[in-house]
Design a protein with these regions (language model features):
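Sequence/structural segment immediately N-terminal to covalent heme-attachment motifs in c-type
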Residues: 28-32
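Positively biased amphipathic helices and basic secretion/translocation or surface-docking motifs
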Residues: 1-8, 22-23, 33-36, 40, ...
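Glycine- and acidic-residue-biased ligand/ion/polar-headgroup-sensing regions
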Residues: 133-136, 142-158, 165
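Short acidic-glycine-tyrosine-enriched beta hairpin
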Residues: 158-178
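A short glycine-rich, His/Asp/Glu-containing loop-to-beta-strand
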Residues: 104-140
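Ligand-binding loop in jelly-roll beta-barrel domains
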Residues: 175-199
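Short Cys/His-rich Zn2+-coordinating modules
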Residues: 13-23
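Short beta-strand His + acidic residue motifs that chelate non-heme Fe in jelly-roll/DSBH
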Residues: 42, 138-140, 159, 177-183
Length: 213
């Protein structure tokens, strides 16, 4: 597997520091399961962070800090498998959300050749799996915020490039594109957005609003 497009360094560092949202952390962890280069970057960042913490002088805790810490430890949290490598069709970090078989997911059809499945992540950012048959494409759109797309099976292309398994495309509000699935097998992507997409055309706008895109 030759991965060409990687998450930005800022995203990797936020993940390493535990500062990324659940949806973004899931996308990065899934990419790491497929990419040894980025695993090394994150490992170095985590090691550097540990060294910095070891050099920090201790300070007195505020009143109630211990009780607050216990409350946070008791709070439920999603199990994102960090540092795991992919050993099957579904990368390890995704399995707690969808199981081990993409074919068993309860896909929802939104347009001819396109279906999606929403992942139950917390926070503002939303994570979805998008399944597109060869030749089909998501309607032309721009972005109110940022969108990150990780290819899990197949591939897709747009005016900005070609994306294969393991590749991550980062799209900002200035990016206008129409991703189209490549010939061959179905393209399944993990897409994370921190704001709604802006579709062109009346029908795509209506469909996007109905399905929460």
């Amino acid at each position: 597997m030759s991965i060409v497009h990687h998450p930005g360094e800022e995203l990797l560092l936020a993940y390493a520091a535990g500062a990324a949202s659940e949806a973004v952390s899931l996308l990065v962890a899934t990419h790491l399961a497929l990419c040894s280069d980025c695993r090394a970057v994150v490992a170095d960042a985590e090691a550097a962070g540990g060294s910095l913490l070891a050099d920090v002088a201790p300070v007195a805790l505020e009143q109630g800090a211990y009780r607050s810490l216990l409350a946070r430890l008791d709070a439920p949290a999603a199990e994102i498998v960090r540092g795991a490598r992919s050993t099957g069709d579904v990368p390890a970090p995704l399995r707690p959300y969808v199981g081990g078989d993409f074919a068993r997911i309860g896909w929802r059809r939104i347009a001819p050749g396109i279906a999606y499945f929403s992942l139950p992540t917390k926070g503002k950012a939303r994570a979805r799996l998008i399944r597109t048959v060869p030749g089909a494409g998501v309607a032309t759109h721009t972005h109110r915020g940022e969108e990150w797309t990780l290819v899990l099976t197949g591939g897709y292309s747009d005016a900005n490039g070609n994306y294969r398994v393991g590749d991550v495309q980062s799209a900002t509000p200035d990016i206008r594109h129409k991703p189209v699935a490549d010939p061959g097998s179905a393209c399944i992507n993990l897409a994370v957005t921190d704001a709604p997409l802006v579709f062109e055309g009346l029908l795509p706008k209506i469909v996007g609003k109905i399905f929460g895109f």
